[in-house]
């Protein structure tokens, strides 16, 4: 049964990144995916740049499997008309489902595009998380 409450719409470019982190933290894949355009790309920097990566859903599910909160700090937003580049720092810290400590952090670069209704959705997202526990979620 679909969720009767629609996920929020990003009013600003940085909001789309924040809403993804909140949805992943809450284990809500549908709400996280709602922030991405159809056909969006989420590239994990640890992957071969020329290779086929996971789908957005697969990458976000891998993060959600940690069952830990994702925090984000915005570093810069560069706006060019209906497109924006959002640079951020993301952090995941806690004890994973296997009772092992997880401490991941790293940079993110996100291209966000204004939609016809005025909201913003992610077209391209690149995450690099590293640190102790990086083997469990290399995003």
Labelled PLM ranges:
Residues 43, 87-89, 123:
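Beta-strand residues in well-ordered beta-sheet regions across diverse protein folds
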Residues 1-38, 134-139:
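Short, low-complexity N-terminal intrinsically disordered segments enriched in polar/charged residues
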Residues 9, 29-81:
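A solvent-exposed, acidic/Ser-Thr-rich amphipathic alpha-helical stretch
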């Amino acid at each position: 049964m679909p969720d009767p409450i629609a996920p929020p719409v990003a009013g600003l470019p940085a909001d789309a990144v924040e809403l993804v982190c909140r949805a992943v933290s809450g284990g809500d894949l549908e709400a996280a995916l709602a922030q991405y355009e159809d056909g969006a790309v989420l590239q994990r920097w640890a992957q071969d740049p020329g290779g086929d990566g996971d789908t957005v859903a697969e990458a976000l599910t891998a993060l959600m499997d940690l069952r830990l909160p994702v925090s984000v700090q915005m570093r810069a937003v560069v706006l060019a008309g209906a497109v924006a580049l959002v640079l951020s720092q993301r952090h995941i810290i806690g004890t994973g489902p296997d009772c092992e400590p997880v401490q991941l952090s790293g940079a993110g670069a996100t291209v966000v595009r204004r939609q016809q209704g005025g909201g913003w959705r992610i077209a391209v997202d690149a995450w690099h998380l590293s640190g102790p526990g990086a083997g469990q979620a290399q995003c």
